[in-house]
Structure formats: C-alpha cells, structure tokens
C-alpha cells in the first residue's frame, strides 16, 4: 500500500533502535499514529530523540503481550528483531502486513535506487559507488545499513538524487518492493548463523535482493557466490570476478567489461587477488551501467577514502605496526585481513560468537599468525578450536590484550585487531571497539 494511504491510521513499530526511530518519525510526518514496543524502553525513555517522538504523539511500552494487533493497519519491524518474535508470529497468524524500515521508505520513494549486499565489503562498496557517482555529476547519497536510515532522508532527497542502499540480510528479510535499478551481491561467507542456523538460510536472505529489482533492473553477483548458490539464483544476473566468462573481470593487470578492456589497474592494485580488488569490480559494474566512463572511474577512485576500522593502519611504535579491523566481525573478514598484512601477525580476536567455527582460520594463519589473544564471550571457543595448532592466550579485556601483544611482538611484526565476532559483550558497537583499540594503542 502506498504510504499516503496510511494517513490517519495506526502503526506498530517493533524495536526502537536507529531504524525504528527513523520509521516512527517518518510515519508521524505522514499522519500516522504510532505505538512503539521495545523491551529496553526504560533505558530509552529519556533519550532526546525518543522524547521528541513522544512529544509528537509516540506511545511506547515494553510489554508486547497486551498489544491487540487487530487495531493496527501496519507493523514495522526493526532489522535486529528475529522472525520468531512473538508479535511477528502473531501478526502473521492474523494476516497482518509486516514490513521493514527499508520497505517503508521505498514505498514513499520515486528515486532511482541501487542496492548493495553481501557478507563483507558492503559499506565500502556503497560508499565507493556513491563517491564515484557524485564525483562525476550524478548526485547520490549512501543510506541504509551504512548508518543513515532511508526513512530519515527519503522525503528530502532531490528528485534526481540516487539512493545507494547498503542492505543487510536482516533488512532484506522484510524487503520485497521491486524498486531497485541495480543491485550487487558481493560475497557470501559464514555470518549471523546464530540467527539463520544454516548457510542456506543466510544465502536465501542475501539473494532476496534479486526479487527487489525492477523489471528493467540489473543484478551483479560475485562469481564464487553465484556458483555455490546457483540453485537460489532463479532470476537473471551477471557475475564479476577473475575469469573471462564474467561480465566484469580482471586479469590482475586490467579490468574488462563484457570482454572489452576498460582500463589498466593502478600499480598498487595489480598482481594479487584481494578483497579490495573485488570491491572495485563490483563498484565498476554498477557505475559503468550508470554511464561512468573508465577514466572517470579511475580519476574518482584516486580521491576515495576507505571507511575506518577496515584494516586501518593506526601507528608504528618501535617497528611494530598496529592495525584496526574492528569491522571484521565474521570468519572470512578475519582471514582477508590477515592475508592483507605482509608482516607476521599478533591477532586480537573475540567478542560475541556468531555461530561459525574458527577452525577455518588455521589454513590462513599457518606461518603468518604468531599468536592469538582471545577476548570476550567467544574466548574459550577460540582457544578450544585453535590451540592445538597455534598459540592462543585468553585475556580479560582489550586493554590487557593490546599490552600483551605489544610485549610479545618485535620490530617488523604487526598487531591486528580483527575480532571475527560481534562487539556488544564489551562495547556499544564495532566503532566503539575500534576507537577504544586506537586509544589503547596510543597509550603504549
């Protein structure tokens, strides 16, 4: 139903995090009466944004058992709320419409939209596409899981402005509007298995993006993911990767599109398969479809700054290099981070376990990682799975891990924070964790 048809009606928002608050504000602006439910209401009630929403009529409660779903015309669920939440199950039983904040924003949008998903690299590719488009006169804004909810911006975007949406699997679970002009699936590796239980379920969520394309839309998929999950790709798509059979590919010297050479890679990009190069291919596939010429892409690439906490060099002290990869929150991200550092590595890992095995690290760590410092809730599991093959030391906190790693490392080594886990056992989020790591390193 178009958003204007909800004027004067009632909406229930489940979860009042960043996207839930944005959805509440958006609905209030659209003339909708809003009830929000959040189990952490007592911690939220005095926050400025919540107070502002309440002043405009938002009603909030923590208890979901007393809610009568029959009185609501629309139910909006926040990304972190699992599909087995009692209210969601009850809503489906009552045949009530349940959507996410992204779907809500798209219903009010007449803009051109690009979608970006995958396990690792989503934020970087979203920001890179946005940067390339803006640098070449195509006004664009990065929204969604990158940090700014779509509903917070959609009513103020210029008519010609392009929305570049970073989409998590959680957001895709409640997104079905066919509004995307282009979309890309970057890679699919183990993550969020505490929610999805199997890789098959996780991959299905990622490939939901293909169902959100316009009829004229174009989907690009990283080749390995396309091969492994071919049975889930029951819609048209093109691949990118390292083989000439891909729509967009590289031979590690140049980039090709449909077999035609586009440009020679800058020297620092040549010679080695890596995560950054795959991100570049994904961004170029999208940008080329938007009319960006090869040299325009290369010129804009020179001024792109990679977002923080992604194998970010912090400083060098006594010949030891320190790197912050706090955004490395899954198994594959840690392996990519370790492979990107051309020094012996002392690795700080751990946090909230996400259901995958750490054994996969061993093939990459052999001869490269000298020692692992395990922290947080996952520390014992990391030690149990790795300690027969590599030195693992459990530390009480990040502070102790940083100090011990610095003490053990010597000139020419690297200390890398790449947790492979979520952050919320000890930190507010991965940004808080990364900033704390930097602070501790600077105190050494």
From Swiss-Prot:
It catalyses: UDP-N-acetyl-alpha-D-muramoyl-L-alanine + D-glutamate + ATP = UDP-N-acetyl-alpha-D-muramoyl-L-alanyl-D-glutamate + ADP + phosphate + H(+). One of its GO terms (biological process) is regulation of cell shape. Keywords: ATP-binding, Cell cycle, Cell division, Cell shape, Cell wall biogenesis/degradation, Cytoplasm, Ligase, Nucleotide-binding, Peptidoglycan synthesis. It is found in: Cytoplasm. ATP binds at residues 118-124. Its EC number is 6.3.2.9. Pathway: Cell wall biogenesis; peptidoglycan biosynthesis. One of its GO terms (cellular component) is cytoplasm. One of its GO terms (molecular function) is ATP binding. Belongs to the MurCDEF family. Cell wall formation. Catalyzes the addition of glutamate to the nucleotide precursor UDP-N-acetylmuramoyl-L-alanine (UMA). This is UDP-N-acetylmuramoylalanine--D-glutamate ligase. It comes from Protochlamydia amoebophila (strain UWE25). The gene is murD.
């Amino acid at each position: 139903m178009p958003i204007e048809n909800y004027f004067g009606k009632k909406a229930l928002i489940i979860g009042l995090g960043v996207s839930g608050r944005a959805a509440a504000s958006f609905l209030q602006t659209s003339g909708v009466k809003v009830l929000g439910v959040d189990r952490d209401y007592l911690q939220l009630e005095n926050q400025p944004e919540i107070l502002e929403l309440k002043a405009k009529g938002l009603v909030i409660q923590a208890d979901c058992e007393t809610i009568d779903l029959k009185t609501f015309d629309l139910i909006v669920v926040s990304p972190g709320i699992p599909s087995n939440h009692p209210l969601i199950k009850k809503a489906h039983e009552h045949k009530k419409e349940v959507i996410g904040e992204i779907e809500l924003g798209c219903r009010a949008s007449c803009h051109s939209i690009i979608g970006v998903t995958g396990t690792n690299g989503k934020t970087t590719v979203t920001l890179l596409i946005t940067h390339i488009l803006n640098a070449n006169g195509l006004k664009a804004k990065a929204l969604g899981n990158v940090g700014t909810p779509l509903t917070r911006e959609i009513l103020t975007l210029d008519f010609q402005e392009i929305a570049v949406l970073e989409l998590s699997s959680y957001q895709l679970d409640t997104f079905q509007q066919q509004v995307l002009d282009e979309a890309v699936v970057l890679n699919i590796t183990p993550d969020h298995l505490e929610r999805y239980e199997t890789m098959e379920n996780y991959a299905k969520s990622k490939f939901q993006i293909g169902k959100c394309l316009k009829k004229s839309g174009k989907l690009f998929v990283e080749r390995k993911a396309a091969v492994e999950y071919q049975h889930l790709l029951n819609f048209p798509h093109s691949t990118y990767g390292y083989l000439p059979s891909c729509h967009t590919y590289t031979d590690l010297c140049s980039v090709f599109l449909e077999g035609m050479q586009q440009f020679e890679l800058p020297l620092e990009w040549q010679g080695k398969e890596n995560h950054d190069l795959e991100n570049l291919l994904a961004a170029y596939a999208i940008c080329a479809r938007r009319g960006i010429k090869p040299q325009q892409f290369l010129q804009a690439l020179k001024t792109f700054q990679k977002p923080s906490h992604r194998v970010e060099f912090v400083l060098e002290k006594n010949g030891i290099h320190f790197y912050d990869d706090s955004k490395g929150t899954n198994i594959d991200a840690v392996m990519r981070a370790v492979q990107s550092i051309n020094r012996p590595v002392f690795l700080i890992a751990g946090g909230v376990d996400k259901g995958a095995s750490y054994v996969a690290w061993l093939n990459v760590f052999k001869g490269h990682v000298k020692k692992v410092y395990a922290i947080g809730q996952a520390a014992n599991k990391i030690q149990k799975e790795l300690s027969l093959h590599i030195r693992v030391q459990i530390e009480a906190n990040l502070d102790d891990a940083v100090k011990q790693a610095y003490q053990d490392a010597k000139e020419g080594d690297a200390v890398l924070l790449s947790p492979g886990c979520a952050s919320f056992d000890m930190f507010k989020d991965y940004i808080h964790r990364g900033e704390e790591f930097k602070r501790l390193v600077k105190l050494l």
